[in-house]
A protein has these predicted regions:
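Short S/T/G/P-rich N-terminal loop/turn motif that feeds into the first structured element of a domain
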Residues: 4-227
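Conserved AMP-binding/adenylation subdomain of ANL enzymes
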Residues: 1
Length: 227
């Protein structure tokens, strides 16, 4: 679900975010959709009054398959590293203690699992998603033996040659931290407006020759979310 801005609106604007940050969260005993909505509204107000003008939007990702490390992920979109640092400094100094009291029993954030990535859009959607929700897939990929970034460029050209679904778009995430081994060679993020569009695109891909041609250059681990 979206919060201060819709991710697709933010990321397909004339000035898309240059950084995306993912903060792991666990639900508490008092967690509910109503309590989450209340916290989102409070958080939006706090951010509006904070030194966070460089935050371009935020949303929440819910995994399609349960993960023991998190129940959901709070996503922050930034226009620059400096803007991100200024906002976090202000938050930590002036707002965090109040927020901790507000969320007690409802949810917990994990500051040991905060992951910042550079963001480069690879392809824009044919039709902008204005629904306020979306689905996505993270692909953590490693080159197979004998392949390299040049083969990824060829694959990207092949992807661009097909309309997989009207709402489909993707980008590449560049970690601004040291990934745990085995570190991916690249992280590819697919996005769609809904599950139906996702299924259309995946069926087209699986029935194409890409999995056995340029798509055979790498092997990926996939993680799916709704937002």
């Amino acid at each position: 679900c979206s919060q201060s801005d819709n991710q697709n609106q933010a990321e397909t604007s004339d000035a898309p975010p240059s950084l995306i940050e993912y903060v792991w969260h666990k639900a508490g005993s008092d967690f509910s959709e109503d309590n989450l909505s209340m916290l989102i509204n409070s958080w939006n107000g706090m951010i509006d009054d904070a030194m966070c003008s460089g935050m371009m939007g935020a949303n929440i990702l819910t995994p399609e398959v349960a993960n023991e490390g998190y129940d959901f992920i709070w996503v922050l979109l930034w226009d620059s590293q400096n803007s991100r640092d200024v906002c976090w400094d202000d938050w930590t100094t002036n707002l965090q203690s109040n927020w901790d009291s507000m969320i007690e029993g409802i949810m917990q954030y994990d500051l040991d699992n905060v992951y910042l990535f550079g963001w480069t859009i690879g392809q824009y959607p044919k039709i902008e998603n204005t629904s306020g929700s979306f689905v996505n897939r993270f692909n953590f990929c490693n080159y197979n033996e004998g392949y390299s970034e040049a083969d990824l460029d060829t694959f990207r050209d092949d992807v661009a040659a097909t309309n997989w679904s009207d709402s489909y778009w993707y980008g590449l995430l560049d970690p601004k931290f040291e990934p745990a081994d085995p570190a991916p060679d690249f992280v590819w993020l697919d996005l769609w407006a809904n599950s139906a569009e996702k299924e259309i695109a995946q069926n087209k891909y699986n029935n194409s020759d890409l999995p056995s041609t340029t798509g055979a250059a790498f092997t990926c681990n996939n993680v799916d979310f709704s937002g």
